[in-house]
Regions:
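Active-site phosphate-binding/coordination module
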Residues: 61-165
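Short, acidic loop-to-helix structural element flanking the phosphoryl-transfer center
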Residues: 57-73, 120-127, 179-181, 234-246, ...
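Residue-level signal for inorganic ion chemistry
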Residues: 70, 81, 105, 196, ...
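Asp-based phosphoryl-transfer active-site loop
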Residues: 42-55
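Mg2+-dependent phosphoryl-transfer enzymes with acidic/Ser/Thr/Gly-rich catalytic loops
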Residues: 39-43, 60, 228-311
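Short, Lys/Arg-enriched N-terminal segments with co-localized hydrophobic residues
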Residues: 17-37
Length: 311
């Protein structure tokens, strides 16, 4: 197979043109590998941190223009993020042309146009309690996501830099529902938890936590800083995309996903076209079809212009 093409899984007759924007028949009879054009990509999904957001946690003018141009051309633009709904509020107006959020690493699907939750998956109560008990013995900030909202201890939110999350200080001050003792609150009045983040004070603490909980039936991802992201078993950005594509009646091979980190790996592997940011982890670049510029040089705009809209 020529570089730039990959076989469409389960098919002998079609390839994905990873350097263009469609699915093509092999055209064996006339010797034309590209063959007959079959369909265009209809949906593009962006991770937030490290992808559509630059190092200053803002969206550049060029990237925003590309998002809006894609929407005007009738393409679906979505977010594929570990963030919850409340953590995305500050971007709601600027990203008005984003139709859906696959948020909380796939545990919650949100209709941004109608501002409604379409689907969610929650962690079993006994698993949440086991994780809380384990975390109680370490210097770790427990950060829960429930019904699209964030909850954490007020004392820890006041010093996020201690947990290597200082870049999010202003956001957490603004959006987190703060309590004195989140573990005690949960045990007294259990509430649905879609996702549970553990922000550790050091990488060693994260390793100890991981060794103690890795046997639990959870989806566990290493994330930025010294954090762990815990989701319901078999829930990921990939499962979220599958659910949303079913809801929107868009085949997976007509999707483009852009990402940079470990929690993007599974969804990148199932997308029609996987795009790694220039700042992506080396193994993420290896598994992707193409690599674009980094998040400080409008890699997302490049993905839109080169692979979604270019004929």
């Amino acid at each position: 197979m020529r570089k730039g093409y990959k076989k469409l899984e389960g098919s002998r007759d079609f390839v994905i043109d990873t350097l263009g924007n469609g699915v093509y028949s092999l055209g064996e009879k006339n010797g034309n590998e590209r063959g007959t054009f079959m369909s265009h990509y209809e949906l593009i999904g962006f991770d937030m941190d490290g992808t559509i957001l630059n190092s200053q946690k803002t969206i550049s003018h060029r990237t925003l223009e590309a998002v809006n141009r894609a929407a005007r051309m009738g393409k679906r633009v979505i977010l594929s993020t570990g963030r919850c709904i409340s953590e995305l509020e500050e971007f709601r107006d600027v990203l008005a042309n984003v139709s859906h959020y696959v948020c909380e690493s796939g545990a919650l699907i949100y209709d941004a146009v109608n501002q409604s939750i379409l689907h969610s998956e929650t962690l079993p109560r006994d698993l949440v309690e086991q994780v809380l008990e384990t975390a109680a013995h370490e210097d770790v900030m427990v950060y829960m996501m429930s019904k699209g909202q964030a909850l954490a201890n007020a004392s820890q939110v006041a010093d996020t830099s201690h947990y290597h999350m200082g870049v999010y200080q202003e956001m957490m001050d603004r959006v987190v529902n703060k309590t004195d003792d989140i573990a005690a609150l949960y045990r007294k009045h259990p509430f649905p938890v879609e996702k549970l983040n553990l922000f550790s004070a050091s990488a060693d603490i994260r390793e100890r936590l991981h060794s103690r909980i890795c046997g639990l039936p959870l989806a566990i991802a290493f994330a930025e800083g010294a954090s762990l992201e815990l989701s319901p078993l078999n829930v990921s950005k990939a499962s979220g995309l599958v659910w949303l594509c079913g809801h929107l009646d868009i085949p997976l091979h007509q999707t483009i996903i852009v990402g940079d980190a470990d929690n993007d790996a599974q969804v990148l592997q199932i997308a029609g076209l996987s795009v790694a940011m220039g700042n992506a982890l080396p193994h993420i670049k290896e598994l992707c079809d193409v690599v674009v510029a980094d998040n400080d040089h409008d890699g997302c705009a490049e993905a839109v212009d080169r692979y979604l809209l270019e004929a």
